[in-house]
C-alpha cells in the first residue's frame, strides 16, 4: 500500500468541496480537481450531451474510477496534496448504481490517504455538470461515509461554514 501525504476532500454533490479546493489552490497548496467533473467538461466541449455521457452508467463509472487511479498514480507520495474526491468515492457510486464493488474496493486498497475530510451538505444546486437531485445527494452522502468507513478510514467532519472558514478548519486539522 502506498503511504501518502494526500488529504481527501469528499462529500455529496453541492457540499462546497470545489470552492474549498479552489481556495486551497489560491493559498498555494497543490490540489487535484474532481476527475469526474473534468471528464464531463471535456466531453461537453467535444460536443457530447450530458445524456450521452452518462447513457452507459457502468462504462461511465468504470471510466471515472480508472481515470482517478491514473491521476493518483502520477502524484508524488510525500507531497501534501488535496484531492477533490479520490478512488474510494467510486465505491459509493458503484453501490448506488448496483455495480459489483470488487474493483473499486480492491483499487482503494492501493493507497493510504493521510486524512479524509467529509463535507456536510449545503442546499442543493444544479449546474451544467451536476445533474443529480436532492434525494440522490442525501443517498450519496450516506454511501460515501459508509464507503470510507468500510475500508478503514475515520472521517473528519467539516461543518457548514463560509469557504475561508472551512479552509481554515481543514488546515487546522491536518
Regions found by a protein language model. Give the residues of each.
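Conserved substrate/cofactor phosphate-moiety recognition/catalytic segment
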Residues: 22-67
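A glycine- and Lys/Arg-enriched "phosphate-lid" helix/loop adjacent to the NTP-binding pocket
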Residues: 98-167
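Pre-Walker A (Motif I) flank of P-loop NTPase domains
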Residues: 2-6
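Glycine-rich phosphate-binding loop used to anchor ATP phosphates in small-molecule kinases
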Residues: 61-111
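Hydrophobic anchor at the beta1->P-loop junction of P-loop NTPases
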Residues: 9
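The conserved Walker
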Residues: 13
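Conserved glycine(s) of the Walker
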Residues: 16
Amino acid at each position: 500500500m502506498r503511504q501518502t501525504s494526500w488529504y481527501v476532500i469528499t462529500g455529496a454533490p453541492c457540499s462546497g468541496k470545489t470552492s474549498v479546493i479552489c481556495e486551497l489552490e489560491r493559498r498555494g497548496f497543490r490540489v487535484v480537481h474532481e476527475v469526474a467533473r473534468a471528464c464531463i467538461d471535456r466531453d461537453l466541449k467535444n460536443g457530447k450531451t450530458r445524456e450521452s455521457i452518462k447513457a452507459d452508467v457502468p462504462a461511465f463509472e468504470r471510466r471515472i474510477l480508472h481515470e482517478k487511479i491514473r491521476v493518483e498514480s502520477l502524484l508524488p507520495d510525500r507531497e501534501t496534496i488535496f484531492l477533490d474526491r479520490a478512488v474510494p468515492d467510486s465505491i459509493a457510486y458503484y453501490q448506488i448504481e448496483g455495480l459489483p464493488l470488487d474493483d473499486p474496493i480492491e483499487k482503494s486498497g492501493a493507497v493510504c490517504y493521510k486524512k479524509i475530510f467529509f463535507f456536510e451538505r449545503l442546499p442543493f444546486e444544479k449546474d451544467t455538470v451536476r445533474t443529480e437531485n436532492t434525494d440522490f445527494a442525501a443517498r450519496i452522502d450516506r454511501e460515501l461515509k459508509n464507503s470510507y468507513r468500510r475500508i478503514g478510514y475515520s472521517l473528519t467532519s467539516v461543518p457548514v461554514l463560509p469557504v475561508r472558514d472551512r479552509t481554515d478548519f481543514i488546515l487546522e486539522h491536518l
